[in-house]
Amino acid sequence: MERTNCSAASTVVETAVGTMLTLECVLGLMGNAVALWTFFYRLKVWKPYAVYLFNLVVADLLLATSLPFFAAFYLKGKTWKLGHMPCQVLLFLLAFSRGVGVAFLTTVALDRYLRVVHPRLRVNLLSLRAAWGISSLIWLLMVVLTPQNLLTCRTTQNSTECPSFYPTGGAKAIATCQEVLFFLQVLLPFGLISFCNSGLIRTLQKRLRESDKQPRIRRARVLVAIVLLLFGLCFLPSVLTRVLVHIFQEFKSCSVQQAIVRASDIAGSLTCLHSTLSPAIYCFSNPAFTHSYRKVLKSLRGRRKAAESPSDNLRDSYS
């Protein structure tokens, strides 16, 4: 989207986006750090799906580490003072880690689908070494598919602008290519995940008709709902705003362009939300993760009570 001279500044939107990115960073780092600890110290049996989940954790942590810089960018009124190269590197890291996370979410869904719906396929006999090999290929593939030309910034009189979440101007062929890649990286995984999960639910309903096995079906349904909610909440708004960008890109009205930029900022910040929601998927994948998160929550509650107890005793002594 071509940027014009009309100002698109909105303190409310910039503060909201900056605050949201800060929360996503904190929650994403905490949730995925606990998951990483669980992988190293609590998970006793590693299977291919665990390898894919581990790579998802790494991708989410990588995404969370880039968010503080963009949060500061928005909280400072879209003023970027770190220079051209850091802008390029961080934008690449943001797009790359986000794409890797989506790829491993899709891989986990496909792995569960094949193991439950088609258990006799030879692909289900993959070794851990093969799973690590597939994971390495996914990382390399996403390096190639991450649009390099997105990572551009433009110098202004007072600061350097680092466009974060909306398409930038450039050659038409290059811009079209990066948009096609974006839609493929979102819509193709969403369609594949929806297909795999619907087939998984149908198969479980046929096989687990006994009343004592219904909790497994309910558990699977909840997991499917979480994954679909994750995609719908995180990526659907961004897809819609990208469509609006192409519909209204010929409009010269400043108000229209301002609205598109603000909508793109909000929708773009939502695409990073999946790193904070992924721990819910870990909990449904293995009880070890549920135990770790409960242990952390109990520890935090215990510290809060310990911090509140001195004031309570002081108040009681003077009553």
From Swiss-Prot:
GO biological process terms held by the UniProt record: G protein-coupled receptor signaling pathway; negative regulation of inflammatory response; positive regulation of immune response; response to acidic pH; response to ischemia; response to molecule of bacterial origin
Protein localization: Cell membrane
Keywords annotated in UniProt: Cell membrane, G-protein coupled receptor, Glycoprotein, Membrane, Receptor, Transducer, Transmembrane, Transmembrane helix
Membrane topology of this protein: Multi-pass membrane protein
Glycosylation, residue list: 5
Keyword Glycoprotein: yes
An MF annotation (GO) of this entry: arachidonate binding
Function: High-affinity receptor for 12-(S)-hydroxy-5,8,10,14-eicosatetraenoic acid (12-S-HETE), with much lower affinities for other HETE isomers. 12-S-HETE is a eicosanoid, a 12-lipoxygenase (ALOX12) metabolite of arachidonic acid, involved in many physiologic and pathologic processes, such as cell growth, adhesion, inflammation and cancer promotion. 12-S-HETE-binding leads to activation of ERK1/2 (MAPK3/MAPK1), MEK, and NF-kappa-B pathways and leads to cell growth.
PANTHER family per record: 12-(S)-HYDROXY-5,8,10,14-EICOSATETRAENOIC ACID RECEPTOR, HYDROXYCARBOXYLIC ACID RECEPTOR 2
Family, per entry: Belongs to the G-protein coupled receptor 1 family.
Protein known as: 12-(S)-hydroxy-5,8,10,14-eicosatetraenoic acid receptor
Organism: Mus musculus
Lineage, opening ranks: Eukaryota, Metazoa, Chordata, Craniata, Vertebrata
Gene that encodes the chain: Gpr31
